[in-house]
């Protein structure tokens, strides 16, 4: 017997990061697998490897099960890099995967192959993961919502939860449009947890960081042939990451961290375009068509977290820019958790997800962190 579910959306479907992201699904975390082993041990690193690959598989399974027209493709994924330190990190990752799992799929590409696959000579090498995927995130949200609505799942947009409290029979949620009584509550507010007072208990456990995006006009045919010719999206290895892909209409999508504030000024977009042209000089004369930004939820340990505040209130959040696939996995695991089966995802579900110290000073702290990361990227640290 299934569960009767109601979705309360503060704005409209896909308004937040779920619709604004880069649509890149890759079976990786911010840390490499040897780094995860060093921090948590071999057994946990192996568990997290399996979870990361399961996450992309769950996303693909949802698309196939509901026949969603959202551009999902197992495109592969590139992590280009310029620093020798990053090359060492990812070379160690390749060796670890082969040694521990016999996984020979990922490899580090040389400069010439990287230049051919990316369309630029900017990088020294790249980590190639052939099992990565790409998707149109807003189309995914919209078509999934339509499929669920057709299966009698109630979705109420423009219905922010302003408060919630436990009752003798479950949880009571207050909204401007009425009150909802439920047996179990799942909070999935991520980088927008401070949007209403109801999410502020969890908002202190993540730091929202703006990520800005520009999209060009469709590329001229000759330029289009050069840019990521094998259709693989890319996320570079810098601390202040850039991510990019060629979209289905032939336009070029380029994103990067948008600064410490919760908004993106024109200065941010101008800097993003300068970064894009520095990497891809052939885009100098291609106009920008669209620009937007959204919030990424960052955690202290760079990992997302799934857990419960009590037996009736659950959460999944803090994806650190890896939420396209991992949020699909967390959705599956949250359903199991609501049904009474706690997930086993190592440090992502181990119960440690505390408030960030001095959270009230997060904006000046972000300025300091961004400046340090910019310096580290400049020196290839």
Report each predicted region and the residues it spans.
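General small-molecule cofactor/ligand-binding pocket signal
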Residues: 106-110, 154-156, 289-291
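Hydrophobic anchor at the start of a short beta-strand
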Residues: 5, 106, 286
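Helical element adjacent to the flavin cofactor pocket in flavoenzyme catalytic cores
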Residues: 88-100, 121-184
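Glycine-rich FAD pyrophosphate-binding loop
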Residues: 1-20
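Helix-loop-beta segment of a Rossmann-like dinucleotide-binding subdomain
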Residues: 42, 69-79, 113-147, 151, ...
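C-terminal catalytic lobe of FAD-dependent flavoproteins
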Residues: 254, 258-379
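Dinucleotide-binding Rossmann-like beta1-alpha1 core, especially the glycine-rich loop
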Residues: 28-112
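Active-site substrate-recognition segment that forms the wall
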Residues: 57, 65-74, 161-163, 168-169, ...
């Amino acid at each position: 017997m299934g569960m009767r579910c109601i979705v309360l959306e503060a704005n409209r479907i896909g308004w937040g990061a779920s619709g604004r992201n880069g649509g890149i699904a890759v079976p990786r975390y911010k840390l490499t697998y040897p780094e995860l082993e060093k921090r948590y041990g071999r057994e946990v690193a192996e568990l997290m490897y399996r979870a990361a690959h399961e996450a992309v598989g769950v996303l693909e399974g949802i698309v196939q099960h509901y026949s969603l027209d959202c551009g999902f493709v197992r495109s592969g994924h590139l992590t280009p890099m310029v620093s020798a330190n990053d090359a060492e990190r990812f070379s160690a990752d390749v060796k670890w995967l082969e040694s521990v799992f016999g996984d020979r799929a990922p490899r580090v590409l040389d400069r010439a192959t990287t230049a051919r696959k990316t369309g630029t000579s900017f990088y020294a090498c790249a980590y190639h993961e052939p099992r990565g995927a790409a998707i149109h995130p807003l189309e995914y949200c919209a078509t999934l919502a339509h499929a669920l609505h057709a299966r009698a799942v109630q979705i109420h947009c423009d219905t922010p939860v302003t408060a919630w409290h436990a009752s003798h029979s479950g949880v009571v949620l207050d909204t401007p449009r009425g009150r909802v009584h439920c047996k179990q509550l799942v909070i999935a507010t991520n980088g927008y947890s401070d949007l209403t007072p109801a999410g502020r208990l969890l908002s202190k456990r993540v730091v929202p960081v703006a990520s800005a995006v520009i999209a060009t006009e469709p590329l001229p045919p000759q330029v289009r042939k050069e840019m990521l010719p094998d259709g693989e999206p890319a996320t570079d290895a810098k601390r202040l990451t850039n991510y990019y892909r060629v979209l289905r209409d032939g336009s070029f999508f380029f994103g990067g961290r948008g600064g410490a504030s919760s908004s993106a000024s024109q200065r941010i977009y101008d800097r993003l375009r300068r970064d894009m042209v520095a990497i891809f000089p052939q885009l100098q004369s291609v106009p920008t068509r669209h620009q937007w930004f959204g919030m990424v939820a960052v955690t202290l340990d760079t990992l997302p977290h799934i857990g419960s505040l009590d037996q009736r209130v659950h959460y999944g959040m803090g994806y650190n820019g890896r939420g396209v696939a991992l949020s699909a996995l967390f959705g599956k695991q949250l359903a199991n958790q609501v049904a009474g089966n706690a997930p086993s995802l190592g440090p992502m579900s181990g119960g440690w997800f505390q408030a960030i110290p001095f959270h009230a000073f997060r904006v000046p702290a972000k300025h300091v962190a961004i400046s340090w990361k910019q310096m580290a990227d400049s020196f290839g640290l």
